[in-house]
Amino acid sequence: MSDFDSNPFADPDLNNPFKDPSVTQVTRNVPPGLDEYNPFSDSRTPPPGGVKMPNVPNTQPAIMKPTEEHPAYTQIAKEHALAQAELLKRQEELERKAAELDRREREMQNLSQHGRKNNWPPLPSNFPVGPCFYQDFSVDIPVEFQKTVKLMYYLWMFHAVTLFLNIFGCLAWFCVDSARAVDFGLSILWFLLFTPCSFVCWYRPLYGAFRSDSSFRFFVFFFVYICQFAVHVLQAAGFHNWGNCGWISSLTGLNQNIPVGIMMIIIAALFTASAVISLVMFKKVHGLYRTTGASFEKAQQEFATGVMSNKTVQTAAANAASTAASSAAQNAFKGNQI
């Protein structure tokens, strides 16, 4: 009956103990169960039952980003490797030099026992004339000078071949112009003259200078080689009636016959190359000469020592002295008689 006596317009939850604000606040903070989970509710609501979601593994490949600065141990390892490589290189160089010195020492011992046998020019054994010089770069020339001496030897050979080709160039020019007989004859003379003279007058002094560190032979080489360079320049110029297929003669021959002119131009280019290479090698040899400690005073001393130790000079001096003494004695004896 009490329900009928209540006010129909009153709040029905007024007397409900479960609608009390303190109770509803506590029940609201409790996470809903699985049956009450609403997927469309606020995303900030934690998963039902307080279940922790498993971590999703990262499917991207693991890539290490290179660092700009290497670790300290890497730098130390690199420096150690470089130092070890440098030591190995020096050791190999020292072993190579030691082997070269041992080989030269053995060869010198063999030469001292059996004597030096001339081996240049390399002529056949049945040839009526034998070799005139002994030449062995590995035995006579120090290692640091062998390359330079070999280049000078190749330069001499190059000039000899150019002189030989010059004969054929002048012969071809003589075939198209009979007035060039003088050039053809002189070309043969230059080949027969300059080939042996250049070998004896400047190459052998250079070879001996580096072999025995002789200042006097260096000065002989410089004097003769300057003259040789002047000859190269004149041959490259090619004046008429000089026996050279230089540029002047080549242009004249080109006007007369094109094939002959082309042949002469090639020879003129070879003469020019000889002149240029000669100048370059002269500067190189002069630079090496300054590093050897040679000087003009040493050259004078070597010349005086060589002259005084020469048996021919000693014999001539003794004969001159005896002749002067005998003539002086005779003059004195005649003066006493008078």
Swiss-Prot record:
Molecular function terms from GO: protein domain specific binding
Membrane topology (Cytoplasmic): 2-155, 203-218, 283-338
Family matches, as InterPro entries: SCAMP
Organism: Homo sapiens
Entries under Pfam families matching the protein: SCAMP
Gene (name only): SCAMP1
Protein name (database record): Secretory carrier-associated membrane protein 1
Region entry Disordered, spans: 1-64
Chain positions with N-acetylserine modification: 2
Keyword Oxidoreductase applies: no
Example GO biological process: endocytosis
Topology of this chain in the membrane: Multi-pass membrane protein
Spans through the membrane: 156-176, 182-202, 219-239, 262-282
Residues the record lists as Phosphoserine modifications: 2
Tissue distribution of the protein: Widely expressed, with highest expression in brain.
Assembly description: Interacts with SYNRG and ITSN1. Interacts with SLC9A7.
Gene Ontology, cellular component aspect: clathrin-coated vesicle; membrane; plasma membrane; recycling endosome membrane; specific granule membrane; synaptic vesicle membrane; trans-Golgi network; trans-Golgi network membrane
Similarity comment: family membership: Belongs to the SCAMP family.
Cited function: Functions in post-Golgi recycling pathways. Acts as a recycling carrier to the cell surface.
Keyword list, A-Z: Acetylation, Endosome, Golgi apparatus, Membrane, Phosphoprotein, Protein transport, Transmembrane, Transmembrane helix, Transport
Ranges facing Lumenal side: 177-181, 240-261
Key word Transmembrane present: yes
Coiled-coil features, chain-numbered ranges: none
Subcellular location: Golgi apparatus, trans-Golgi network membrane; Recycling endosome membrane
Source taxon at top rank: Eukaryota
Modification type Phosphothreonine: residues: 45
Primary location: Golgi
